[in-house]
A protein has these predicted regions:
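Structured catalytic/nucleic-acid-binding cores of DNA maintenance enzymes
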Residues: 1-171
Length: 171
């Protein structure tokens, strides 16, 4: 049976590849870092992964799907804010306590985003045509002030993406 496949990437951030064999698919999947939505790994593994990238900023680390998978730009901003970590910090300077905070922030925020259908940014829609509701919960991404009233800075970080962050909170 033939099944139509639709791919709409209005923001031009995505890629679409077709694996022609199970081996090709397995190779790609095995190249990805651990998924925050899956059990079987935890804060100790996360800390060890961070320490393997001492010369990368935490923003670069989170956005590289070979390190950890499932984090995009809005999740990066929200998770770093929740963990109170600056996107400019290098992985080698992240303490165990900070790494634990970041791991649990990522897991919690990604789960909540997934449960609420993701974030509708611009004209994004889920396959059923509905908007994701997580954008209504943004603390810093696309906001002017943080929940505690601090100014949010928007700047390009070393991951080459615009990052929303709060210097008064994130150290």
């Amino acid at each position: 049976d033939s099944v139509p496949l639709y791919y709409n990437d209005v923001r031009n951030f995505g890629t679409f590849k077709i694996a022609l064999s199970k081996n090709a698919l397995d190779k790609k999947i095995n190249s990805l870092g651990p998924d925050f939505l899956k059990d079987g790994w935890g804060p100790d593994t996360f800390y060890n992964l961070l320490k393997k990238k001492p010369n990368k900023t935490v923003a670069e680390f989170l956005m590289n799907q070979k390190n950890v998978s499932g984090i995009g730009n809005y999740l990066k901003a929200e998770c770093l804010y929740d963990a109170k970590i600056s996107p400019h910090r290098f992985c080698c300077h992240i303490t165990t306590k900070e790494s634990d905070r970041l791991f649990y922030a990522c897991r919690r925020i990604i789960q909540l985003s997934y449960q609420t259908g993701g974030a509708t940014i611009q004209n994004y829609r889920k396959p059923n045509g509905k908007k994701g509701l997580y954008s209504q919960r943004f603390a810093v991404y696309n906001q002017k002030t943080s929940p505690c009233g601090n100014e949010i800075i928007k700047e390009q970080t070393l991951d080459k993406r615009t990052t929303h962050w709060v210097p008064a909170v994130q150290k």
